């Protein structure tokens, strides 16, 4: 068996790769590792999910696994991933479990686990959970009164909405937003949050039926949102994914405002308000060179991490910084949460618009996106490519030819025998030519 945990929990085709049996084993193992009995009474676990059909089956299995290990379950129902992380801390739970495959198609599902305080797990803790789940370490199995009980949390959504309200320093009166909820976990709370802050809200794709999550909508399919923003004459559009841990935006003309541009707007606003710790932003190596240039021109330092919001979080924690994120729209505000929060990002973005009186297109123009070409190359051995002197020489030659006007990044896939070749340059044709040449070199190894 390969490693259970990927870059964002356990994920796979529901009922084939991610079975009820596996969900029970993982939940029981997580409870064994993260909720050891001690003083203060029985430990608790928050459980939430997105609305995809398999979530009900997996929720039942997760609840069974947790209670079989002696943990009481606080079931919060359908809520975004960041809400589950927040409630794990708010309710003083020993762990939290979110059942979701995020932006993946409906047939997939996943299990994300949070430690006490709503923090994502590090590799060492994941390895310990995996050891218990696969039977190489002993799981806890109490009997009688030691078995956990199940409780619902009827005010879970209200608690999360109140939390979001406290994170927004100003009102959004006068702004009109179209929000694409991806028929996902934020279909109720996202429109409610934006309305509570004073915005006029047009909600689309906010009628989940268990089967339509992420189907031609949400942050991976922006076409419908772009048309709706123009049709309604809205100030902007916001797109969430199935579990609402990310947010992308669309300006009044229907043009994309991606995660890099969103971070630019937020970083400049937080700097002006004295909220940007050490005038530093944390982003991944996949962020566009245009973000680097914009931050440098603004006097803001940029710390780069590996791809994945868990690595952004590590960078934020290690430096004590206050803003980080990814091009894909995961944005983290450590003062208000422990993971990417799409609804909070949308609120803060509109807050900057309300504060300045400027449209989002004007605010986002502080960053110019450089042309980027990405080529996926199938390889026999990713490690051989990484160690190849021929590939290294080709990368160095490409970097010399670009100088300060571009960059090159080779990144092995975390799940497939692929190497991703990315080239950015001020000229699209130059980027294409270099990317194709490098892809050919990688393929020849």
UniProtKB/Swiss-Prot annotation:
Listed InterPro entries: A-D-PHexomutase_a/b/a-I, A-D-PHexomutase_a/b/a-I/II/III, A-D-PHexomutase_a/b/a-II, A-D-PHexomutase_a/b/a-III, A-D-PHexomutase_C, A-D-PHexomutase_C_sf, A-D-PHexomutase_CS, Alpha-D-phosphohexomutase_SF
Cofactor: how and how many bound: Binds 1 Mg(2+) ion per subunit.
Function: Catalyzes the conversion of glucosamine-6-phosphate to glucosamine-1-phosphate.
Domain of life according to the entry: Bacteria
Designated name of the protein: Phosphoglucosamine mutase
Cofactor: Mg(2+)
Catalytic activity of the protein: alpha-D-glucosamine 1-phosphate = D-glucosamine 6-phosphate
Family from the record: Belongs to the phosphohexose mutase family.
Post-translational modification: Activated by phosphorylation.
Organism in which the protein naturally occurs: Rhodococcus opacus (strain B4)
GO cellular component term, pick one: cytosol
Amino-acid positions noted as binding Mg(2+) in the UniProt annotation, renumbered to this chain: 102, 241, 243, 245
Any GO BP: peptidoglycan biosynthetic process
PROSITE patterns (UniProt xref): PGM_PMM
Modified sites of kind Phosphoserine: 102
Active site, renumbered: 102
Keywords tagged on the record: Isomerase, Magnesium, Metal-binding, Phosphoprotein
Lineage: Bacteria, Bacillati, Actinomycetota, Actinomycetes, Mycobacteriales
One Pfam family in the UniProt entry: PGM_PMM_IV
Top EC category: isomerase
EC number, as in UniProt: 5.4.2.10
Gene for this chain: glmM
Gene3D superfamilies recorded: Alpha-D-Glucose-1,6-Bisphosphate, subunit A, domain 3, Alpha-D-phosphohexomutase, C-terminal domain
Leader sequence segment: none
GO molecular function: magnesium ion binding; phosphoglucosamine mutase activity; phosphomannomutase activity
């Amino acid at each position: 068996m390969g490693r259970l945990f990927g870059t964002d929990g356990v994920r796979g085709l529901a009922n084939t790769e991610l079975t009820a049996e596996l969900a029970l084993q993982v939940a029981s193992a997580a409870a064994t590792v993260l909720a050891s009995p001690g003083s203060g009474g029985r430990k608790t676990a928050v459980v939430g999910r997105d609305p995809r059909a398999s979530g009900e089956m997996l929720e039942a299995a997760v609840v069974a696994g947790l209670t079989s290990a002696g943990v009481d379950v606080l079931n919060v129902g359908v809520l975004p991933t960041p809400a589950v992380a927040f409630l794990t801390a708010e309710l003083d739970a020993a762990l939290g479990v979110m059942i979701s495959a995020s932006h993946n198609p409906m047939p997939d599902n996943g299990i994300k686990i949070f430690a006490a305080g709503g923090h994502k797990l590090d590799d060492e803790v994941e390895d310990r959970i995996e050891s218990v789940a696969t039977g190489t370490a002993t799981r806890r199995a109490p009997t009688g009164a030691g078995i956990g009980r199940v409780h619902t949390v009827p005010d879970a959504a209200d608690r999360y909405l109140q939390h979001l309200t406290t994170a927004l320093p100003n009102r959004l009166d006068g702004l009109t937003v179209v929000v694409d909820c991806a028929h996902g976990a934020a279909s109720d709370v996202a429109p409610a949050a934006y309305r509570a802050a004073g915005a006029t809200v047009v909600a689309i794709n906010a009628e989940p039926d268990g089967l339509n999550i992420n189907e031609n909508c949400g942050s991976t399919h922006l076409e419908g949102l772009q048309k709706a923003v123009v049709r309604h004459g809205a100030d902007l559009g916001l797109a969430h994914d199935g579990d609402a841990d990310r947010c992308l935006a669309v300006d009044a003309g229907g043009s994309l405002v991606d995660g890099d541009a969103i971070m630019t707007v937020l970083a400049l606003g937080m700097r002006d308000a004295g909220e940007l710790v050490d005038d530093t932003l944390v982003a991944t190596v996949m962020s566009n060179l245009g973000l680097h240039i914009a931050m440098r021109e603004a006097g803001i330092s940029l710390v780069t991490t590996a791809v994945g919001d868990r690595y952004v979080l590590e960078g934020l924690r290690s430096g004590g910084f206050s803003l980080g994120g990814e091009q894909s729209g995961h944005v983290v505000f450590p003062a208000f949460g422990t993971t990417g929060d799409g609804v909070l990002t949308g609120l803060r973005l509109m807050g900057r618009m309300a504060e300045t009186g400027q449209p989002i297109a004007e605010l986002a123009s502080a960053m110019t996106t450089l042309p980027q070409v990405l080529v996926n190359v199938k390889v026999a051995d990713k490690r051989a490519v990484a160690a190849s002197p021929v590939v290294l020489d080709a990368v160095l030659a490409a970097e010399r030819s670009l100088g300060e006007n571009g960059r090159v990044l080779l990144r092995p896939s975390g799940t497939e025998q692929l190497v991703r070749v990315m080239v950015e340059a001020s000229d699209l044709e130059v980027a294409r030519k270099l990317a194709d040449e490098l892809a050919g070199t990688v393929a020849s190894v």
